[in-house]
């Protein structure tokens, strides 16, 4: 049985970890980094870049470089948060046929789960390269405050990437696992403050020792799925653009290339201001007008940056108050405060958290890696490798159905431990009503219209009866992933209808299957492209070696032999420009064969000459190197 890997699919960066010898280990990617930018670029030739290579070319390809796609996952196009992002993102956010927010790249409409799947595939490959075996199962984390549609969409992304998602777990819970696994300090209540690239979560978690078992029980969770480091970056971008406009009368936000350079600079400046009190943003040739090129040079102090984002930091405090109230604990009951997410490195954020909780946050948890580590631990629990750990998570939002008068009747209250099941009996509103529509909602508002609609289905063929007589039992069942299954049953006839909530939008199974096939096709094309590049490298190497040997020892061959080798070189040089791998390999072999005569001649000459002078030895090596070099290249290709 293969390993279950843990993946933190982040808005800005992603991370993968695995349990090894009872300890979680974060895995470095192909670029040698422990985190991978969640950036995907679609090239003109159809190639898809993921991670650092995609981020590097963002300035020159802003419209086709996608970042922060997690902010769109499982969301409707008309939601106000999505509308706000449309104005900020250099890429095109568009409305799908089902009303979801999708992205348009190079004339093709893509669903957010399809784009996120590219990042997951990179994480999968990173783990496979390290483990030396295929990986098919994963635990993927999501913000605790993600609703049902967003969780379902994340699961879909895993499927498209070729992963069976064994469990979806909440990011703060994962961080608590990473923090508390090796702590033998009895019962303690902790607060996990998770401010990432695009989302904010706060969870109050109790870690207890029960019969030698570590129990992690989430008491409450709250958050804001549209608050994160990206918003802090945007404040800096606006500030820089405004300063430049004041001075030069040009708004850089209207120029995609300039805006992308601003984004890069803002991110760097923000990071620098965590360790120094002032930084300078220096962007030469940012734009030009009739008077010539323009340069942007702006000094930013830490105090200035803090004043720009003060309200964003303040926005994170309200959910903390609600979470404490929901958990029924006082600030003084919290023993440890754990910071997760890169944005918590900002001194002002740490200061605000310290001020609210009245204690210094812990510094022994890596904010970038804790979530992936926790996911890997949960993978180990599911696999049976990690014993004595029990995780009790909660559903972040209340769930219910719409009843008479457009009211939301809650069946499951927020912060209920999952998995859980709840039933309630409802009846008809009209005489002789033969069908009822079950409209499933998620949220905290009293009226149905103020909450998120998760979907609806009908229960038909109810026997005619006066209003209020039929007994319709509605059952809500939330699984361990926090995904909802709903059934409605007519108690008189036993007739039942049930659905797993697929958001009234979301991806259908057919769409997911198509995207899986597309992903597999791309993987196949990538493999073919790599094999073609390897074949070209072998051919180049053979041409170089033979030409070198001809220049040094060509006079030992007669004209016909020399002509045959030159012809083989020419033929290989002609096919190397094309895309036919078989032709390149065949002509490479033909060249190696043709040049063997040269090798023999040189070898023979070397044998007859005196060993003192040893002119033959290096010559013999040169030709040998030519033959062996080509063979060596081929062996290396196979490994690839």
Swiss-Prot record:
HAMAP family: DnaK (MF_00332). Residues 626-640 have a biased composition (Acidic residues). Keywords: ATP-binding, Chaperone, Nucleotide-binding, Phosphoprotein, Stress response. Belongs to the heat shock protein 70 family. It comes from Methylobacillus flagellatus (strain ATCC 51484 / DSM 6875 / VKM B-1610 / KT). GO terms for molecular function: ATP binding; ATP-dependent protein folding chaperone; unfolded protein binding. The modification Phosphothreonine is found at residue 199. Acts as a chaperone. This is Chaperone protein DnaK. PANTHER family: HEAT SHOCK PROTEIN 70KDA. Residues 603-640 are annotated as: Disordered. The lineage of its organism: Bacteria, Pseudomonadati, Pseudomonadota, Betaproteobacteria, Nitrosomonadales. Induction: By stress conditions e.g. heat shock.
């Amino acid at each position: 049985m293969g390993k279950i890997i843990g993946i933190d699919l982040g808005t800005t960066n992603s991370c993968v970890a695995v349990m090894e010898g009872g300890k979680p280990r974060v895995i470095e990617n192909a670029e040698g980094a422990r985190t991978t930018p969640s950036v995907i670029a679609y090239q003109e030739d159809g190639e898809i870049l993921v991670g650092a290579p995609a981020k590097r070319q963002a300035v020159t390809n802003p419209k086709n470089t996608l970042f922060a796609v997690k902010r769109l996952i499982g969301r409707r196009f008309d939601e106000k948060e999505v509308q706000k992002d449309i104005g900020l993102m250099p890429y095109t956010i568009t409305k799908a046929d089902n009303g979801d927010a999708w992205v348009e790249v190079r004339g093709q409409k893509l669903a957010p789960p399809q784009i996120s799947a590219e990042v997951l595939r990179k994480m999968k490959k990173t783990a496979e390269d390290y483990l030396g075996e295929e990986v098919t199962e994963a635990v993927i984390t999501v913000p605790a405050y993600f609703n049902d549609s967003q969780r379902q969409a994340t699961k879909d992304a895993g499927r498209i990437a070729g992963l069976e998602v064994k469990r979806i777990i909440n990011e703060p819970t994962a961080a608590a696992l990473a923090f508390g696994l090796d702590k033998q300090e009895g019962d303690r209540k902790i607060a996990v403050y998770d401010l990432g690239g695009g989302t904010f979560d706060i969870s109050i978690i109790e870690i207890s020792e029960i019969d030698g078992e570590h129990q992690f029980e989430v008491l409450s969770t709250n958050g804001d799925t549209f608050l994160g480091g990206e918003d802090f970056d945007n404040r800096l971008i606006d500030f820089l653009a405004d300063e430049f406009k004041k001075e030069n009368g040009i708004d850089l936000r209207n120029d995609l290339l300039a805006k992308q350079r601003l984004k890069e600079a803002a991110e760097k400046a923000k990071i620098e201001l965590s360790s120094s009190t002032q930084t300078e943003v220096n962007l030469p040739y940012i734009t030009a007008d009739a008077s010539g090129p323009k340069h942007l040079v702006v000094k930013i102090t830490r105090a200035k940056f803090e004043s720009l984002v003060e309200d964003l930091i303040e926005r994170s405090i309200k959910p903390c108050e609600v979470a404490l109230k929901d958990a029924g604990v006082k600030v003084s009951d919290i023993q440890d405060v754990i910071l997760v997410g890169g944005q918590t490195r900002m001194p002002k954020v740490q200061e605000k958290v310290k001020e609210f909780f009245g204690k210094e946050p812990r510094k022994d948890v890596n904010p970038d890696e804790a979530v992936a580590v926790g996911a890997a631990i949960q993978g180990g629990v599911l696999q049976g490798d990690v014993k004595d750990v029990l995780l009790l998570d909660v559903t972040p939002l209340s769930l219910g159905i719409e009843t008479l008068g457009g009211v939301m009747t809650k069946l499951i209250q927020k912060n209920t431990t999952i998995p859980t099941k709840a039933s309630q009996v409802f009846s008809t509103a009209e005489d002789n009503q033969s069908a009822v529509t079950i409209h499933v909602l998620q949220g905290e508002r009293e009226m149905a219209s103020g909450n998120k609609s998760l979907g609806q289905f009908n229960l038909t063929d109810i026997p005619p009866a006066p209003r209020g007589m039929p007994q319709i039992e509605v059952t809500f069942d939330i699984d361990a992933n926090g995904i909802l299954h709903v059934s409605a049953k007519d108690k008189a006839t036993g007739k039942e209808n049930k659905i797993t909530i697929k958001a009234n939008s979301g991806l259908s199974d057919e769409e997911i299957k198509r995207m899986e096939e597309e992903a597999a096709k791309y993987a196949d094309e990538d493999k073919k492209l790599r094999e073609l590049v390897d074949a070209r490298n072998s051919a180049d190497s053979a041409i170089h070696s033979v030409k070198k040997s001809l220049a040094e020892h060509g006079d030992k061959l007669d004209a016909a032999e020399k002509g045959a080798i030159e012809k083989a070189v020419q033929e290989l040089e002609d096919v190397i420009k094309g895309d036919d791998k078989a032709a390149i390999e065949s002509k490479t072999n033909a060249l190696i064969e043709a040049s063997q005569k040269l090798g023999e001649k040189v070898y023979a000459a070397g044998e007859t000459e005196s060993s003192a002078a040893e002119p033959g030895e290096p010559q013999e090596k040169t030709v040998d190197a030519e033959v062996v070099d080509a063979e060596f290249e081929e062996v290396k290709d196979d490994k690839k």
